[in-house]
Amino acid sequence: MIWTFVILIAVIVGWYWYEGDWDRRLFKAQPGSVCANLNAGQANAWLREHPETQVLDVRSSGEFEGGALPGAVNISIGESSFETKVAALNKDKPVLVYCAGGFRSRKAVIVLKQLGFRNIQHIHRGYMSWQPDSQP
């Protein structure tokens, strides 16, 4: 019985550590890097300080209709025309990208980088981390 408990605790601790480490390895944000990984509060501050930011929601249209960040443009990463539509955005302006939980938007960041966007901000944990009091 005690070994079951020990193994269970080890699995939980290992999973928790791996999840955090996976986030850090997959999505490093360093000063001067092409992309910054922001929490909801930091994203809110960014939007206040940079009102010219293009807010890109890469969730499905159904998710977008259920609620979105103020001023967001919805271009679903699941669309076959995603790259074409994103390429029409202004590459000289900052882009704040998000999805529901942070996974799809990470894929979008890669596409944005490949298309030549230089100032990309990403909301870590996505829309689910956005609270009403986080709004600008």
Regions found by a protein language model. Give the residues of each.
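Rhodanese-like catalytic fold shared by cysteine-dependent sulfurtransferases
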Residues: 1-49, 53, 61-94, 100-136
